[in-house]
């Protein structure tokens, strides 16, 4: 019985370590990648630009994308 409990705890510890390593080893978000939920995760040469989505003047959503620093995007009509 003690062996089963010890084995279970050991497996739990191993799985926890693997998950922690995966989270810390995640790469940065590339150009035009969505960064809405992780605004600080763009690669070092990029910034996270956020835009408000409006419908009849009321904000209905917010979307963020990684874009180049010092680049301005304008709407083309």
UniProtKB/Swiss-Prot annotation:
Keywords for this protein: Disulfide bond, Secreted, Signal, Toxin
Family assignment from sequence similarity: Belongs to the neurotoxin 19 (CSTX) family. 10 (U11-Lctx) subfamily.
Chief localization: secreted
Tissue expression pattern: Expressed by the venom gland.
One of the Pfam families matching this protein, by short name: Toxin_35
Signal peptide from the UniProt entry: 1-20
This protein's GO CC annotations: extracellular region
PTM comment text: Contains 4 disulfide bonds.
MF terms in GO: toxin activity
InterPro entries associated with the record: Spider_toxin_CSTX_knottin
Domain of life, per lineage: Eukaryota
Listed name of the protein: U11-lycotoxin-Ls1b
Record keyword Signal present: yes
Compartments (UniProt record): Secreted
Propeptide residue span(s): 21-26
Entry annotated with the keyword Ion transport: no
